[in-house]
């Protein structure tokens, strides 16, 4: 294998076990045999004297108050979630209720197990910068106890030249709050089609819904279904399927006084219950202006599903499922603009080949056209993308990952035609970045992996995960990278070399 073309920076990000959030803790419900102990615990707290209750609560605030935003509000919320278990909830004092909430809470270190798979986009705030500087937002895959992944962020400034400064990531974290979202009827239609749900109950609901609707409208339409339809054998099952499909779209928002690095996108639906993995962010631009888009993998402990998110400011995020044969595997990367009026994405629907998929008029990603299959020795097991294509004068620059002997991951590159991205113009025969002695050891050894790079002033900046142990940064000049590529054979030449018809 040839040596890496990219140059590593000295700056790295490592997992910080002090980055914690508060989660609901219900004793007994995490055991092999589920039997809640909530009522007994609340009864024991209620029997504490006023002095002991006050002392315990003060001690808890002293120990944990500086580590979290609005600790009292969280305790109130967790008490409200279990108050129905209290024998005489009205008899509990405000202090006792807060203490009950504390007993039903625990800290979770979001990145204690691993920190990896970053992507990089221009930050929404470009104020107070010097000449040649660009502030960037770096998305991070954070992995904590139980191998649950969430999406975090860091902020950095790149330039001039190859200078890099990463902002401090300290301060209490926030997981955001679910907020109202305007659901799209066409996405519900696509989701039901994906699950082959086409009966009179579903058709009646879809006919009654407007193009955009809120949760109250959705539930009102369900409540007004004729009894004759609900009494059919498929009635209740279809209602459950409608609610499950609709719940896949949601929105979450963070307080305005939180910094980007304090925001954590935490799993919020059953499909995401075991993690939100490998977010690939891109700044998408069309006639309505710029917006941040990303794809990520939702994991429920058994199966995966591809999700998309959109945000105008990286403070409010809307999540929706992605549908269609082009979206049935991990690692979808969106193009930063439409090409010929088409929304395009890179994918790997077959598990080993990079393909190009198009969004159709029914909001389904079509079956992909193959772009690049394993060919070089360092990528013979499988290939995939390392983030969204980057537009250059020479074409669409695509970073790839390939898997070689001993499941060693390295990063390569392709160049696609700017106007016909289904055509590969050139490829890098060697590696752009491969694990060195400093990168090879970690939770998942022998891996370098990126979910998205960025070009600034002629330099390609590649954030990368190193064996899930840390996040590093590497750079290479775009002209140097392009000059190291070799021209791809034309389709006719490739056919002749394979001994095709003729």
Can you say where each PLM-predicted feature lies in the sequence?
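Electrostatic interaction modules used in gene-expression and signaling proteins
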Residues: 453-455, 463
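Donor nucleotide-activated moiety binding/catalytic core segment of transferases
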Residues: 378-386, 446-449
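Beta-rich carbohydrate-recognition and catalytic domains
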Residues: 1-274, 282-332, 337-381, 391-443, ...
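A conserved acidic, glycine/proline-rich C-terminal tail/linker
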Residues: 439-453
């Amino acid at each position: 294998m040839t040596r890496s073309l990219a140059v590593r920076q000295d700056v790295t990000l490592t997992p910080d076990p002090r980055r914690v959030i508060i989660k609901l803790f219900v004793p007994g419900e995490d055991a092999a045999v589920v039997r809640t102990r909530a009522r007994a615990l609340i009864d024991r707290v209620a029997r504490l004297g006023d002095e002991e209750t006050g002392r315990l609560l003060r001690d808890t605030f002293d120990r944990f108050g500086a580590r979290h935003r609005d600790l009292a509000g969280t305790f109130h919320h967790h008490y409200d979630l279990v108050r129905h278990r209290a024998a005489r909830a009205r008899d509990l004092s405000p202090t006792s209720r807060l203490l009950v909430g504390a007993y039903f809470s625990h800290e979770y270190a979001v990145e204690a197990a691993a920190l990896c798979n970053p992507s990089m986009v221009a930050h929404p705030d470009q104020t107070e910068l010097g000449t040649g500087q660009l502030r960037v937002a770096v998305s991070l895959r954070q992995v904590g106890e139980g191998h649950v992944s969430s999406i975090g962020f860091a902020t950095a400034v790149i330039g001039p030249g190859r200078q890099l400064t990463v902002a401090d990531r300290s301060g209490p974290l926030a997981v955001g709050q679910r907020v109202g979202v305007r659901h799209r009827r066409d996405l519900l239609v696509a989701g039901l089609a994906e699950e082959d749900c086409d009966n009179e109950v579903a058709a009646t609901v879809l006919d009654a819904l407007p193009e955009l609707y809120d949760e109250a409208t959705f539930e009102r339409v369900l409540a007004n279904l004729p009894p004759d339809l609900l009494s059919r054998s498929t009635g209740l099952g279809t209602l459950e399927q409608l609610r499950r499909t609709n719940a896949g779209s949601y929105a979450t928002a963070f307080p305005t006084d939180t910094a980007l690095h304090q925001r954590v996108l935490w799993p919020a639906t059953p499909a995401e219950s075991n993690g939100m993995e490998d977010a690939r962010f891109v700044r998408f631009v069309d006639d309505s202006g710029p917006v941040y888009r990303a794809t990520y993998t939702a994991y429920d402990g058994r199966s995966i599903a591809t999700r998309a998110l959109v945000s105008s400011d990286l403070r409010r995020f809307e999540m929706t499922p992605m549908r269609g044969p082009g979206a049935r595997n991990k690692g979808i990367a969106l193009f930063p603009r439409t090409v010929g009026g088409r929304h395009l994405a890179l994918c790997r629907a077959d598990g080993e080949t990079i393909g190009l998929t198009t969004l159709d008029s029914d909001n389904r990603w079509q079956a992909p056209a193959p772009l690049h299959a394993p060919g070089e020795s360092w990528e013979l097991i499988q290939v995939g993308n390392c983030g969204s294509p980057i537009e250059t004068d020479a074409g669409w620059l695509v970073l790839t990952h390939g898997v070689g002997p001993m499941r060693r991951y390295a990063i390569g590159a392709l160049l696609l035609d700017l106007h016909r991205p289904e055509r590969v113009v050139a490829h890098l025969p060697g590696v752009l970045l491969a694990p060195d002695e400093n990168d090879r050891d970690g939770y998942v050894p022998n891996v370098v992996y990126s979910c998205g790079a960025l070009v600034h002033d002629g330099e390609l900046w590649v954030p990368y995960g190193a064996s899930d142990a840390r996040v590093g940064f590497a750079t290479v000049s775009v002209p140097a990278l392009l000059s190291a590529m070799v021209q791809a054979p034309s389709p006719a030449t490739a056919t002749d070399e394979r001994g095709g018809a003729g």
